[in-house]
Amino acid sequence: NALLKSGQPELIYSKALEYYQKEKWSRASTLFEGVQHYYSGTPREDSISFFNARCKYKNRDYDTAATLLDDFRRKFGRSAFIEDAEGMYALCFYYLSPGPSRDQTMTGQALIAINEFMSRYPHSEQIENFKTINTELTQRLHDKAYLNAYTYYKIGRYKSAIVSLKNALKQYPESSHREEIMYLIVDASYRFASNSVAEKQTDRYLAMLDSYLSFKEEFPESKHIKEVDRMAQHARDYLDRNKQEDNNI
């Protein structure tokens, strides 16, 4: 780029701003990066750093933008751009966060950054948008925990399913999947007991009945009630028969 080779920082900066205002993000970023070292330690340093990071953000290069914005907020904590920078930093992780079927590490990072922003800037114009995003990302974590547990259930690994489902409830007690998770715990416990060797069935049916009573108490009007009632009756019948056999010995 001839302009960058000109050695005229004011001209380069002026052209970078022109591209920036015209939303030509790639061209603006190239010039901001090329002129940055000229203004190191000057009052213009934070502006150039912010504009360049925003160019990356607008170009949807969220990985690079997040790195630049993190550097910016650490270095220029008192800048006039700090609120915007921290908002964009949080949003980078939001846009990098994948759907619930994939690893949710980025979602966790997004939630941390978003909650930090809301705590720091409770009166921000962006606060309502961030609240909405916070709800969406939290739901994504609930979905992930549910899907992980359901996968074990679906492939017939009922012991693992029970553990995973209980962990999902423990981790996210307010989950929108709570009813379905508690139902699956009952169902998986019933199947696990039914498929167990005789000497372990009694304890496992008793554990299943505990899960059943918890489910019925919390969701007495559930669409699954008839089904879990049937399972519970089968478990009780087994326990009664077993008790009679023990008494006859």
Please provide the spans of the model-predicted regions:
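Acidic, polar-rich low-complexity tracts and alpha-helical solenoid repeat scaffolds
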Residues: N1-I249
